């Protein structure tokens, strides 16, 4: 199979067709944070689609944008030069969302970022080792009494 090329184009939101087998989910709090990021930064990441408008990546962005702007709103999308097979689609989904692009440096997060802001911006307490963030001598809320 030849290398797939991706081109930037514009599409109406109503024309984009979500993948019924998309394994990614978003809860209300995450959707609200995503909407807040659109308000502050605009649509930084595009939605990736196939030649016939099937969504490969960006289902959560699509849902939030539809709720915010409606189906007639146009967005920039990345269009594959050819359709992906189901196996390629599964593989792409995992690659894009499960660490293929790197991991967090928790030392940098702990020393250079504010915990409250990280939690506001989308980290969950379970994602962070909260004990690392406690000043010396201060007990964690989760510590036994």
Could you tell me what each predicted segment is?
Residues 1-145:
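Aromatic/glycine/proline-enriched transmembrane-helix motif characteristic
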């Amino acid at each position: 199979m030849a290398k797939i090329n991706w081109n930037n184009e514009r599409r109406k939101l109503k024309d984009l067709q979500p993948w019924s087998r998309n394994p990614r989910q978003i809860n209300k709090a995450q959707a609200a944070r995503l909407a807040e990021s659109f308000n502050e930064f605009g649509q930084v990441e595009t939605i990736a689609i196939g030649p016939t408008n099937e969504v490969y990546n960006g289902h959560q962005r699509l849902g939030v944008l539809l709720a915010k702007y409606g189906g007639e709103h146009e967005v920039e999308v990345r269009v594959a030069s050819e359709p992906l097979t189901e196996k390629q689609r599964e593989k792409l989904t995992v690659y894009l969302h499960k660490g293929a692009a790197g991991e967090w440096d928790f030392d940098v997060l702990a020393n250079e970022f504010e915990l409250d802001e990280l939690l506001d911006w989308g980290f969950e307490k379970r994602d962070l080792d909260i004990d690392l963030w406690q000043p010396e001598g201060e007990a964690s809320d989760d510590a036994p009494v």
